[in-house]
């Protein structure tokens, strides 16, 4: 922190729909660049680990498992960095699935925030 300010960045990774491994590699690279530039908090788009337009695939256990593995890989690859990263991914909770922002730093999950408003895409 310099002069009481926190350096924050937003990043938009290249994303392939339902390719969590590719997406996590893109996210890793952007986190490393931001960390090298002294960024303290980096924010990514919602569902950036899986891609936003997976539609029916969000109901598949395999996609959720791959997203979780991708998150673990990001956490492992950024374990030595001080940067706080906020990434979007689908999360299973009991019998429901949520679109959530996951806050991570130094290989730990600090919070999971579910999206509170889900558009129905029939709105004008």
What residue spans do the PLM features occupy?
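Hydrophobic structural segments
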Residues: 1-124
């Amino acid at each position: 922190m310099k002069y009481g300010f926190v350096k924050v960045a937003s990043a938009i990774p290249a994303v392939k729909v339902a390719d969590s491994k590719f997406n996590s590699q893109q996210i890793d690279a952007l986190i490393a660049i931001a960390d090298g530039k002294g960024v303290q908090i980096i924010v990514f788009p919602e569902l950036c680990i899986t891609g936003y337009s997976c539609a029916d695939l969000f109901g598949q256990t395999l996609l959720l498992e791959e997203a979780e593995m991708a998150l673990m890989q990001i956490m492992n690859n950024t374990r030595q960095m001080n940067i706080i990263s906020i990434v979007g991914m689908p999360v299973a909770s009991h019998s429901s699935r949520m679109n959530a922002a996951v806050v991570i730093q130094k290989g730990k999950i600090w919070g999971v925030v579910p999206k509170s408003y889900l558009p129905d895409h029939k709105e004008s």
